[in-house]
Amino acid sequence: MSKDFNYATGRRKNAVARTRLYEGTGAITVNGKPYEDYFPRKTLQMIVQQPLKLTKTLGKFDIKVNADGGGVAGQAQAVRHGISRALIEIDPELRSILKRAGLLTRDARKKERKKYGQPGARAKFQYSKR
């Protein structure tokens, strides 16, 4: 049995995007909704489309994404990461284009934990000398 899709996982902050690329017409669905509805802001839509535009594959693949965790921006960037990884599985020659644009690098920055004895991760309670 041959698989009819390419699978990749993208991550950003606490968001995880499990991405499947099928041969198709260019429909992108995120959690069962068209990506335009799931990411209503144009900037987030551009983030999702970025790997497809760079590799000139916009309209060649149907993409189904299951996005979990994090916020909307983190999910959009996780989707971009997942699409980029899946495109390499299909055509390894696209790797140099995506690598140059920095779309294959997992952005490891996460929220720093709050420490005890402080109101936040780095902030300190106000110091009173007297």
UniProtKB/Swiss-Prot annotation:
GO biological processes: translation
Alphabetical keyword list: Ribonucleoprotein, Ribosomal protein
Chain intervals for the UniProt region annotation (Disordered): 109-130
Matches recorded under Pfam families: Ribosomal_S9
InterPro entries per UniProt: Ribosomal_Su5_D2-typ_SF, Ribosomal_uS9, Ribosomal_uS9_bac/plastid, Ribosomal_uS9_CS, Ribsml_uS5_D2-typ_fold_subgr
Highest taxon in the source lineage: Bacteria
GO CC annotation, single: cytoplasm
GO molecular function: RNA binding; structural constituent of ribosome
Membership in a protein family: Belongs to the universal ribosomal protein uS9 family.
Protein name per Swiss-Prot or TrEMBL: Small ribosomal subunit protein uS9
Organism per entry: Maridesulfovibrio salexigens (strain ATCC 14822 / DSM 2638 / NCIMB 8403 / VKM B-1763) (Desulfovibrio salexigens)
Gene behind this protein: rpsI
